[in-house]
């Protein structure tokens, strides 16, 4: 716990990442706010949302990576662990390979500066037809960065009681894990089938795995 609270870490994300931030806070680990053009981070966890830090909307992965690059260059002398996650709208088949190539370049830049990078697999949604590109990116991440620490969000959000939630071999976020009227996201509202926000209780559970990944990469 002391290591996670003391190791300067910056995590940039969109709304599913905000669910995880809220979940971490429920476990006693608050992310300090990181905002636009900010050039400082505090010891421990720092978090920023792309809609604010950019601002850049979902569905613009290359713009997001430029925001990530600019933020990293502002704080690279201070931060020890750096991470960002795509939103579910950022990963499409038509430009997935180009996004992956730019992501790999960005990771290399972070590591060349002596900073540790924490990978996060892209979130999936409830509607299975939208998820194959996201699964393909996950598989690429696991193969390309096999020796790195990867927070496999996609894996855990598509499991319920050890059973995989899938349709015809395509994973989906489980009904028990998604934001519904029975268990809404803390801040993102009730989801339609094309979204993938996290039930507040599940976000707190999944955030433990995120925090453990931060610990692992900081060792």
Model regions and ranges:
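Oxyanion-hole/transition-state-stabilizing segment in secreted/luminal serine hydrolases
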Residues: 61-100, 122-125
């Amino acid at each position: 716990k002391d290591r996670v609270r003391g190791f300067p870490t910056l995590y940039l994300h969109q709304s599913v990442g905000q669910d995880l931030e809220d979940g971490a806070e429920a476990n006693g680990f608050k992310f300090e706010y990181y905002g636009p053009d900010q050039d400082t981070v505090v010891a421990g966890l720092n978090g920023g949302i792309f809609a604010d830090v950019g601002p850049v909307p979902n569905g613009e992965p290359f713009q997001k990576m430029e925001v990530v690059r600019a933020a990293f260059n502002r704080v690279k002398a201070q931060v020890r662990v750096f991470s960002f996650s795509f939103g579910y709208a950022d990963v499409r088949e038509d430009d997935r390979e180009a996004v992956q190539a730019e992501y790999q370049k960005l990771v290399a830049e972070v590591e060349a500066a002596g900073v540790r990078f924490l990978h996060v697999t892209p979130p999936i949604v409830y509607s299975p037809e939208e998820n194959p590109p996201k699964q393909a990116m996950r598989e690429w991440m696991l193969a390309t960065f096999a020796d790195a620490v990867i927070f496999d969000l996609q894996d855990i959000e598509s499991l319920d009681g050890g059973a995989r939630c899938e349709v015809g071999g395509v994973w989906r976020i489980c009904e028990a894990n998604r934001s519904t009227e029975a268990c809404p996201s803390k801040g993102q509202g009730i989801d339609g089938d094309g979204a993938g926000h996290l039930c507040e209780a599940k976000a707190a559970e999944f955030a433990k795995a995120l925090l453990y990944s931060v610990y692992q990469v900081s060792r």
